[in-house]
Design a protein with these regions (language model features):
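Bacterial N-terminal signal peptides
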Residues: 17-28
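Acidic/hydrophobic-patterned starts of short beta strands in beta-sheet-rich repeat architectures
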Residues: 48-54, 108-123, 163-175
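A short, structured loop/turn motif at beta-sheet edges
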Residues: 74-78, 107-115, 139-144, 159-168, ...
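Acidic, small-residue rich beta-repeat scaffolds with periodic aromatic anchors
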Residues: 34-63, 172-289
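Repeat-based blade/solenoid architectures
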Residues: 82-103, 150-158, 213-214
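Beta-propeller blade repeat segments, especially FG-GAP/WD-type strand-to-loop junctions
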Residues: 72-74, 130-146, 183-202
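N-terminal signal peptide c-region/cleavage motif recognized by signal peptidases
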Residues: 30-32
């Protein structure tokens, strides 16, 4: 199941992280200043491979430190290093599962080749962004582990064997839709499915039409909910992306135009500007050719 899910940190963490972003570390005081940083150790194992993720947490400063990952094979250390600063200018590499009382390090054979990878899920400390993962792959020729860093953005991911072939796809949401057509609260995101092979992640979403169909159906019902008063342009944009992936772009845009004229699709953008921006955005992001 999921190392961490789509929803981001809980309310307590979002509020604290937002205060840090706006006012600095001194703004967040959740315990007495005298409390010392508390050390933590997480362990994960599969076969002969064991990963140990250690760190300290200072609750008064809302800050993690001394983050270190060690990977052993048959009891012999093959990798040991302190974590680098997060990509994208994040202020702190936080264990993604810490505040949900879950592990953030996993040993699992993602690609089904018999050699387990080590996955470290992290968060870099914003109101709801950003989640990222470090995936460590063993290279027998060099007897070393090489990391791949992937930024998920405002969402996490789940592992799922969608192809039923023994390998695991990584299912997430397309974060590029955040704020594109509405506020974050009124944005929605089409499903995005990645495959890990030979140390690389590739987008394989179009392969999984049934997953796209289920996602499109849920988005459509959300957009057309008669109780919804806020903008639904962000939801419709995500739905249109799904439709493009299954070859229904022309029908989707006709539907959008008809419902925009009747007022059932509404938001900050006028009908013409929304349709123009949506076409341009879907071309730029690879959904529409």
């Amino acid at each position: 199941m999921a190392p961490f899910g789509f929803r981001g940190y809980n309310g307590r963490v979002r509020a604290a992280a937002l205060a840090v972003a706006l006012f600095g570390l001194g703004a967040v005081v959740v315990t007495t200043a005298a409390a010392a940083p508390k050390p933590h150790v997480e362990r994960a194992r599969a076969g002969a491979v064991e990963a140990v993720f250690s760190y300290s947490y200072d609750a008064a400063a809302f800050r993690f430190s001394r983050q270190r990952l060690v990977i052993d094979r048959d009891g012999v250390t093959s990798f040991a290093a302190r974590l680098r600063k997060p990509p994208g200018g994040g202020f702190n590499a936080q264990p993604a599962g810490y505040f949900a009382h879950r592990r953030s390090v996993f040993v699992t054979d993602i690609d089904g080749d018999g050699e387990p990878e080590v996955v470290l899920d992290l968060y870099w400390g914003g109101a709801h962004c950003c989640w990222y993962s470090q995936i460590y792959r063993y290279a027998p020729a060099t007897k070393r582990y090489a990391p791949l860093v992937h930024v998920w953005g405002n969402f996490g991911y789940v592992f799922a064997d969608l192809a039923h072939d023994g390998s695991q796809e990584l299912v997430t949401r397309d974060d590029r839709f955040s704020y594109a057509f509405a506020s974050f609260a009124d944005s929605r995101w089409p499903v995005r499915i990645l495959r890990y092979r030979a140390g690389r992640l590739t987008v394989e979403t179009p392969t999984y039409r049934s997953e796209i169909g289920r996602d499109a159906n849920a988005l459509w019902h959300a957009a057309m909910n008669p109780k919804r008063k806020a903008s639904n342009q962000g939801i419709v944009a995500a739905w249109a992306a799904d439709q493009c992936l299954v070859g229904h772009a022309a029908v989707a845009f006709k539907t959008i135009d008809r419902l925009s004229r009747s007022g059932k699709i509404h938001g900050e953008l006028s009908r013409v500007k929304f349709e123009q921006k949506l076409r341009s955005f879907l071309r730029r992001t690879g959904y529409l050719s």
